[in-house]
Regions:
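Short amphipathic alpha-helix with an adjacent loop that forms part of the alpha/beta core around
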Residues: 53-63
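Residues forming the Rossmann-fold NAD(P)(H) cofactor-binding site
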Residues: 6, 77, 183
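Beta-strand-loop-alpha-helix segment that lines the small-molecule cofactor/substrate pocket
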Residues: 66, 72-73, 77-124, 139
């Protein structure tokens, strides 16, 4: 459990997610056990604690129906495939995986299992994007010929890049700005305007930060 996973757990136990109950959580770090023990659902039920994903899948499968994956990108495929193999639904935080091959493998496993598979792209719920989507679908914007979007709010400081050993690295994250922040923009583009027919990309390295992954996309 990391910072995002902790946030999701608190939202569920607080009753902020309708029809969802937190029945189990995987905690590998000893210092978070006390935090895990404090997780109590609104009905007074405590969440079970497992010390590894392997333990959850092997001994705890009867206590849950779905899995939320909020781990570093490169772990998504393995965890999702194990969950689908156990007949569980999967809600995976973005991105699906670190490369297209892993993402397609996850999609194939989901299809074969017949279970629900969803991705967490929270910006689709922003009121501005919901309104734009409505305007496009209703034809209020006419025949759209060109779209240009520049987003500068995702500039990350060195503190962010150093906040996790897996961040901003090919080994841990699978890339830099494009896979971390840029995917939000790419998701909104295809959600609002459909899939592109052609792509061109320019990805600078070392423009703002001294690391080997892309720091602008």
């Amino acid at each position: 459990v990391g910072s995002v996973g902790k946030k999701y757990a608190r939202m569920i136990t607080a009753g902020e997610v309708p029809h969802m109950k937190l029945s189990a959580v995987v905690i590998r770090r000893d210092e978070l056990i006390e935090w895990g023990e404090s997780l109590v659902n609104t009905d007074g039920d405590n969440a079970r604690i497992f010390r590894s994903a392997e333990e959850l899948f092997e001994t705890g499968e009867s206590c849950y129906d779905a899995v939320i994956i909020a781990t570093p990108h490169k772990t998504h495929k393995e965890l999702a495939l194990k969950a689908f193999a156990k007949g569980k639904a999967v809600l995976c935080d973005k991105p699906a995986a670190a490369d297209i091959g892993e993402a397609l493998a996850m999609q194939k496993a989901a299809s074969e299992s017949g279970r629900i598979y969803g991705m967490i792209f929270h910006q689709r719920l922003y009121p501005k994007y919901i309104r734009i989507k409505q305007m496009i679908d209703n034809g209020e914007l006419g025949d759209i010929k060109r779209v240009c979007l520049i987003n500068s709010r995702y500039l990350r400081t060195s503190y962010y890049h150093k906040s996790g050993s897996w961040r901003s690295s090919f080994a841990g994250e699978g890339g830099g700005a494009l896979i971390n922040q840029g995917q939000h923009i790419l998701d909104m583009y295809q959600y609002l305007f459909g899939m592109p027919q052609k792509l061109f990309a320019a990805i600078p390295f070392g423009k703002y930060n001294d690391f080997i992954v892309d720091d602008e996309a």
